[in-house]
Design a protein with these regions (language model features):
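Nucleotidyltransferase catalytic core that binds NTPs
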Residues: 1-178
């Protein structure tokens, strides 16, 4: 784990954590605000997680990883893992509350990311058995409608629009920077 002061720790802190996975390309105010809301609402420190591997993207180079880690200096701890899927993340961080956006939560349930529906169900059961849950931040869709889950189920906590709303995605921020 890379700490805000730039040092590195190798042990997972004691007590319940909130883990905020993402690519953080770039880390922006929406990430910071969502982390603050989760820390306040759930009473858990928020650590960020950057996986070198991703089911939809090429593996991150050392240079890219180091650049993304640097964004967290003076802000928050960040873990660098090889855990591309949440079942693997739950093995690394048992008991964690994973902080995800609406689109990531939908992908978590999408059968196309699993061999079949039974594998998806087994993966979600493994996450549940490790005591992990998800907190989901909603988002504004292309019609300017705030989207979040109405019936989240036992694995998910949903933040309302009053809890958290940030209207600019990382993709939109990257497009504005180019």
């Amino acid at each position: 784990m890379h700490l805000p002061d730039g040092s590195v720790a190798h042990a997972i802190p004691q007590g319940p954590l909130a883990i905020f996975p993402g690519s953080f390309d770039p880390l922006h105010d929406g990430h910071r605000t969502l982390a603050a809301v989760v820390a306040w609402k759930f009473g858990r420190p928020v650590h960020f997680e950057l996986s070198r591997t991703n089911v939809e993207k090429p593996e991150l180079s050392d240079e890219v990883v180091n650049t993304r880690i640097e964004q967290f200096r003076g802000f928050a701890p960040i873990w660098v893992t090889q855990a591309a899927i949440f079942e693997a993340k739950s093995a690394l961080f048992p008991g964690a509350l994973f902080v995800v956006g609406f689109d990531t939560a939908l992908r978590l349930l999408d059968a196309k990311y699993y061999a079949d529906g039974a594998h998806r169900d087994a993966s979600l059961q493994a996450i549940r058995e490790r005591g992990c849950r998800f907190v989901v931040g909603g988002r504004i869709d292309s019609s300017s409608v705030f989207r979040t889950w109405e019936n989240p189920g036992e694995l998910f906590e949903v933040l309302t629009e009053a809890d958290f709303r940030f209207d600019l995605s990382s993709t939109e921020l990257r497009a504005k920077l180019c």
